[in-house]
Amino acid sequence: MKSKEELFNMPIVELREYMNSLSNPEIQEVAKIFEEDDIERDPLELLTASKLFDYMKYANGSVN
């Protein structure tokens, strides 16, 4: 998995592609990194990563 610095320095298009390549537990780890960051980021930029919809279902217990 990429480091915090790598994630924050990725262009948004590359970050979306990276998010789509992760498993649900890995997405959860990345989400925690972004939650703990002091810099406010627009979460809507990542919503076009199609894998995030699957993760939201996973996080809410809808998907195993």
Give the role of each language-model region.
Residues 17-64:
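Acidic, low-complexity, intrinsically disordered interaction modules
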Residues 1-7:
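Extended non-catalytic scaffold regions that mediate assembly and binding
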